[in-house]
Amino acid sequence: MTRSIKKGPFVADHLLKKIEKFNAQGQKKVLTTWSRSSTILPVMIGHTISTYNGREFIPVFVTDQMVGHKLGEFAPTRTFKGHVKSDKKAKRR
């Protein structure tokens, strides 16, 4: 179920305030945030936002194609190391 249009997209208040402040000053600093559930808005285009994935901050450069997605979509939390080639259990003859 999608979010109500009446409510609007969720963006953490502290993140939105920082971005609006940087836009007013014309700065392009790297922002760090733990808010993976914040929606990317058009005012964030051109900024680099470091999103926490549970272990480290992953820098995400926001482009126009990312608008409407969540910040957490671009900072994966799990590392896939690949399947083992010589795994006999996986082969099953």
UniProtKB/Swiss-Prot annotation:
Question: InterPro entries from the entry?
Answer: Ribosomal_uS19, Ribosomal_uS19_bac-type, Ribosomal_uS19_CS, Ribosomal_uS19_SF
Single Gene Ontology MF annotation? rRNA binding
> What Gene Ontology cellular-component terms does the record carry?
chloroplast; mitochondrial small ribosomal subunit
Q: What is its main location?
A: plastid
Domain of life, per lineage: Eukaryota
> Keyword annotations for this protein?
Chloroplast, Plastid, Ribonucleoprotein, Ribosomal protein, RNA-binding, rRNA-binding
Matching Pfam families = Ribosomal_S19 (PF00203)
| Any one Gene Ontology BP term | translation
Where located?
Plastid, Chloroplast
Q: Briefly, what is this protein's role? A: Protein S19 forms a complex with S13 that binds strongly to the 16S ribosomal RNA.
Give the record's family classification.
Answer: Belongs to the universal ribosomal protein uS19 family.
Q: What is this protein called?
A: Small ribosomal subunit protein uS19c
Taxonomic source organism: Tetradesmus obliquus (Green alga)
